[in-house]
């Protein structure tokens, strides 16, 4: 079984990881939100009537239309929800990951196996998903309402949260919880990929230190691995969270059946191009922010 040496001081302090994760999460949103908006709009556009073209022809067309009708601000529509929620989401993710690794560590330089890293990462994914759901629900509604045929129903994050609560209570805010947990279930692969590449960079380094470039490359690659596995669940989540109440009576199962019946398996990968285009820079930004904060806290 392959093992990787991870310092408890640097990698497995839940309190420091909580702070570093929050900073990394904010870096993620600032870098990745424009492509996230395009991704959500492609995933949630309705099936066109027979003989009619789809609302968007692809990533470039969606980006061009967004800029033409909404300007630069259109790409950052709904950003306040993830920015407000991103600190606890990523803070929980990295804190639980650190706590999970600590469970396997008995001293400051215990060698963890990759299955142990995977287990800690998977646990972190489930816990952070529970925090993610309300902000994801609000973000998706704000990102998609401007391209619907009806009037604007929501005016910002607080207004959306208040209206959702009035409509269906806490349950409405947490619509799509199961789908979100499934979407974040590959988090174990995310952390394994990152730790493996960082350890590889450390071994190849003359002084045993990891450069900023290595952190960016490792983080970006981890993001691509994660999202390649998560895309189908993300499509189902976006469809469910953007649909009017009562559209899918059995939740994610109803979304899946409807999607297969009307659009086929190909629809599960709708929006994959902007997802993968966004995955590298946004995830690289996460780990850059995390490692920079870890270094500052260690100083």
Swiss-Prot record:
Q: Which organism is it from?
A: Drosophila melanogaster
Say if the entry is tagged with keyword Membrane.
yes
Q: Which PANTHER family match?
A: CONGESTED-LIKE TRACHEA PROTEIN-RELATED, MITOCHONDRIAL BASIC AMINO ACIDS TRANSPORTER-RELATED
What is any one of the record's Gene Ontology cellular component terms? mitochondrial envelope
GO MF terms, alphabetically ordered = magnesium ion transmembrane transporter activity; O-acyl-L-carnitine transmembrane transporter activity
Q: Where in the cell is it found?
A: Mitochondrion membrane
What family does this chain come from, according to its entry? Belongs to the mitochondrial carrier (TC 2.A.29) family.
Q: What is this protein called?
A: Mitochondrial magnesium exporter 1
What is the role of the protein in this entry? Answer: Mediates efflux of magnesium ions from mitochondria, suggesting a role in magnesium homeostasis.
The residues that cross the membrane are 79-99, 114-134, 216-236, 272-292
Q: Which domain of life is it from?
A: Eukaryota
Q: What changes when the gene is disrupted?
A: RNAi-mediated knockdown results in accumulation of magnesium ions in mitochondria, and reduced lifespan. A magnesium-deficient diet rescues the reduced lifespan phenotype.
Q: Which residues form a coiled coil?
A: none
Q: How does it sit in the membrane?
A: Multi-pass membrane protein
**Keyword match Hydrolase:** no
Chief location category: mitochondrion
Which spans of this chain does UniProt mark as Solcar repeats? 12-103, 112-200, 210-296
Q: Which GO terms describe its biological process?
A: carnitine transmembrane transport; intracellular magnesium ion homeostasis; magnesium ion export from mitochondrion; mitochondrial transport
Keywords carried by this UniProt record: Magnesium, Membrane, Mitochondrion, Repeat, Transmembrane, Transmembrane helix, Transport
């Amino acid at each position: 079984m392959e093992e990787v040496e991870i310092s408890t001081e640097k990698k497995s302090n839940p309190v420091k990881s909580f702070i570093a994760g929050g900073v990394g999460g904010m870096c993620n949103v600032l870098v990745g939100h424009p492509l996230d908006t395009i991704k959500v709009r492609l995933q949630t556009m309705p099936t066109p009537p027979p003989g009619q073209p789809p609302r968007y022809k692809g990533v470039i067309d969606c980006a061009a239309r967004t800029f033409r009708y909404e300007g630069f601000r259109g790409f950052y529509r709904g950003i306040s929800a993830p920015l407000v929620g991103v600190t606890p989401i990523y803070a929980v993710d990295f804190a639980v990951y650190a706590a999970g690794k600590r469970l396997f560590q008995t001293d400051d330089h215990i060698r963890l196996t990759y299955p142990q890293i995977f287990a800690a990462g998977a646990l972190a994914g489930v816990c952070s998903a529970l925090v993610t759901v309300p902000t994801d629900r609000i973000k998706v509604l704000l990102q998609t309402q401007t391209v619907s045929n009806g009037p604007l129903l929501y005016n910002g994050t607080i207004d959306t949260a208040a209206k959702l609560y009035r409509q269906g209570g806490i349950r409405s805010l947490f619509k799509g919880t199961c789908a979100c947990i499934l979407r974040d279930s590959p988090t174990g692969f995310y952390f394994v990929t990152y730790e493996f590449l960082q350890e590889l960079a450390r071994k190849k380094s003359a002084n045993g230190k990891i450069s900023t470039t290595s952190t960016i490359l490792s983080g970006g690659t981890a993001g691509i691995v994660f999202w390649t596995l998560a895309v189908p669940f993300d499509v189902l989540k976006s469809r469910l969270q953007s649909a009017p109440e009562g559209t899918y009576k059995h939740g994610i199962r109803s979304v899946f059946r409807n999607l297969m019946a009307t659009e086929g398996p190909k629809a599960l990968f709708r929006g994959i191009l902007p997802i993968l285009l966004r995955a590298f820079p946004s995830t690289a930004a996460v780990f850059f922010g995390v490692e920079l904060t870890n270094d500052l806290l260690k100083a």
